[in-house]
Amino acid sequence: MNEIKLGKKISEGKTVDVYESGDLAVKVFKPDAPKTVVFYEAFMDSKVEETGLNVPKIKEVELIDGKWAIATELIKGKTLAQIMQEEPENCDGYLDDMVELQLEIHSKKVTGISKLKDNLRAEIESLDVIDHIKRYDLLTRLDSTPKHVKLCHGNFGPENIVVTDDNKVYICLLYTSPSPRDMR
């Protein structure tokens, strides 16, 4: 394993900052990030890799200056959000493309990672700003939703889709995480 040298910061978030490092994108977690969260995220991203979806592949997990980091392939290109801003006349077509990509994501079955339904249940149960009647209503509605192990991105949008110069489309997993509370 080579020591990673961080280059230009390409993204900044509440719990992670992302840097370029040669042909890698390095997601550096804030100092208080538990090791378990970092390794679970790397595990989840690896499970998504196994589906065959175009996602940046994980190359390593390591400590950098006392902070945990996940290094993946650096995908050079523009986000679909940037392209849509540059070509507003083509937005309808890009939205159709997003729907197809979303359907492709949802067609993948993944086992061994936390289920969105379980995460939502925990979130609802932890809310102290709603009364027990509203909590019961929300949990009942959640229980009525289908049970399956299909993949869900968690924050799917044009800013999380990268299109390379040769029109290859990659799904950015920077926002994949086990709990909506952990969203960056």
Where are these regions (language model features)?
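ATP-binding glycine-rich phosphate-binding loop
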Residues: 2-20
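ATP-binding glycine-rich loop module of kinase domains
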Residues: 14-37
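The N-lobe alphaC helix and its flanking beta3-alphaC-beta4 segment of protein kinase-like domains
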Residues: 36-47
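Short beta-strand micro-motifs within the conserved protein kinase catalytic domain, predominantly
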Residues: 59-66
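Conserved short submotifs of the Hanks-type protein kinase catalytic core
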Residues: 67-78
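Conserved kinase catalytic-core helix
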Residues: 81-114
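An alpha-helical support segment within catalytic cores of ATP-dependent transferases
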Residues: 107-154, 164-165
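Single conserved hydrophobic/aromatic residue that forms the stacking wall/gate
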Residues: 175-184
